[in-house]
């Protein structure tokens, strides 16, 4: 039997992690743009 609770936690963390990485990369990109100007 599949452990539903940990599986749900993992499925919930994956999009949050991806979103966090995307936001961090975007902020660093914006910050780099401002420094170049």
UniProtKB/Swiss-Prot annotation:
Give the family this protein belongs to, as stated in its UniProt record. Belongs to the PetG family.
What is this protein's record name? Cytochrome b6-f complex subunit 5
How does the protein associate with the membrane?
A: Single-pass membrane protein
How does the record describe its quaternary structure?
A: The 4 large subunits of the cytochrome b6-f complex are cytochrome b6, subunit IV (17 kDa polypeptide, PetD), cytochrome f and the Rieske protein, while the 4 small subunits are PetG, PetL, PetM and PetN. The complex functions as a dimer.
Q: What do the Gene Ontology cellular component annotations say?
A: chloroplast thylakoid membrane; cytochrome b6f complex
**InterPro entries referenced in this protein's UniProt entry, alphabetically:** Cyt_6/f_cplx_su5, Cyt_6/f_cplx_su5_sf
- One Pfam family name from the record? PetG
Location within or outside the cell: Plastid, Chloroplast thylakoid membrane
Annotated keywords: Chloroplast, Electron transport, Membrane, Photosynthesis, Plastid, Thylakoid, Transmembrane, Transmembrane helix, Transport
GO function terms (MF aspect): electron transporter, transferring electrons within cytochrome b6/f complex of photosystem II activity
User: In its UniProt record, which GO terms are filed under biological process?
Assistant: cytochrome complex assembly; photosynthesis
Instruction: Relate the protein's function as given in its record.
Output: Component of the cytochrome b6-f complex, which mediates electron transfer between photosystem II (PSII) and photosystem I (PSI), cyclic electron flow around PSI, and state transitions. PetG is required for either the stability or assembly of the cytochrome b6-f complex.
Show the stretches that span the lipid bilayer: 5-25
């Amino acid at each position: 039997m599949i452990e539903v609770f940990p599986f749900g936690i993992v499925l919930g963390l994956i999009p949050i992690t991806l979103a966090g990485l995307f936001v961090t990369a975007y902020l660093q990109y914006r910050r780099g743009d401002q420094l170049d100007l």
